[in-house]
From Swiss-Prot:
Belongs to the bacterial ribosomal protein bL36 family. Keywords: Ribonucleoprotein, Ribosomal protein. The keyword Lyase does not apply. GO terms for molecular function: structural constituent of ribosome. GO terms for cellular component: ribonucleoprotein complex; ribosome. This is Large ribosomal subunit protein bL36.
Amino acid sequence: MQVLNSLRSAKQRHPDCQIVKRKGRLYVICKSNPRFKAVQGRKKRR
């Protein structure tokens, strides 16, 4: 899963890509091609 600042380009990669909001974060999911999954936001620091 990619972590991106903006999902604008991620949602246009494939016609089956959808934007879903879960737990206050935006996700792009693609059931036909799962390699296009993405989430908007920053990685958590350890």
